[in-house]
């Protein structure tokens, strides 16, 4: 909904139905978050903008099937289980982007951004529009965790991880960092201007998987999975 339409401005609604007024700064200017919210977005482009008070940054959350590319000083964030996010950055133009796909490929016309084959092509093409070049791009890859015990014979996280690494190798985009597989969900925070990524491993929320590890006698894995989680810089 465009809150700048002529006539009486319509205010955006939260899911709860509560009206959310835009933040007006001194002098009557809208905050950058509200300016970002007001911009027209492409299909599949992330549009959940907010102020991250931990980093003191404007932020955008990338949901499954979405992507976001920017040369602005903000943070692009997502949370991953078996899904994969590729963070691709071109230091020459100081621009980067992130996607979030659920499966390597599929034949559904709905939610095509959920499939890696399309999500990777879309991310790279949007970076090229920002002036990036393939020969200058580098990638950091995250996710692919085995968070569901039912996928032991055909692990989705492993398939996603193999797909994205093979894809980037074919495209000759070097993977300079990765934090993949394992059993931990991850919160990924990507800074597209600098190319830096902060990853927090989250406490495991699937006790059935922990039970499997306990039966295997993997005490160290169980202890790690139930702890608060660590934060790493990539």
From Swiss-Prot:
The protein's name in its UniProt record: Probable chemoreceptor glutamine deamidase CheD 1
HAMAP family for the chain: CheD
Alphabetized PANTHER family for the sequence: CHEMORECEPTOR GLUTAMINE DEAMIDASE CHED-RELATED
Enzyme Commission number: 3.5.1.44
Keywords: Chemotaxis, Hydrolase
Keyword check for Transcription regulation: no
CDD domains: CheD (cd16352)
UniProt-listed InterPro entries: CheD-like_sf (IPR038592), Chemorcpt_Glu_NH3ase_CheD (IPR005659), Cytotoxic_necrot_fac-like_cat (IPR011324)
GO molecular function: protein-glutamine glutaminase activity
């Amino acid at each position: 909904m465009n809150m700048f339409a002529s006539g009486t401005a319509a205010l955006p609604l939260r899911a709860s139905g509560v009206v959310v007024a835009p933040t007006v700064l001194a002098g009557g200017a809208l905050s950058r978050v509200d300016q970002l919210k007001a911009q027209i977005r492409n299909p599949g482009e992330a549009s959940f903008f907010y102020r991250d008070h931990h980093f003191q940054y404007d932020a955008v959350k990338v949901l499954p099937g979405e992507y976001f590319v920017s040369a602005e000083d903000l943070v692009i964030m997502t949370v991953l289980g078996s899904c994969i996010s590729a963070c691709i950055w071109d230091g020459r133009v100081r621009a980067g982007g992130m996607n979030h796909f659920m499966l390597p490929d599929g034949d559904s016309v709905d939610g095509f951004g959920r499939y890696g084959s399309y999500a990777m092509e879309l991310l790279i093409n949007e970076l090229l529009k920002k002036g990036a070049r393939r020969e200058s791009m580098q990638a950091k890859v995250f996710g692919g965790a085995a968070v569901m015990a039912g996928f032991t014979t055909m692990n989705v996280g492993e398939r996603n991880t193999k797909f994205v690494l093979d894809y980037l190798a074919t495209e000759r985009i070097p993977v300079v960092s990765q934090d993949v597989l394992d059993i931990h969900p991850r919160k990924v925070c990507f800074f597209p201007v600098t190319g830096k990524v902060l990853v927090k491993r989250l406490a495991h929320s699937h006790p059935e998987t922990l039970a499997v590890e306990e039966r295997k006698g993997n005490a160290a894995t169980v202890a790690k999975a139930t702890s608060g989680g660590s934060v790493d810089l990539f």
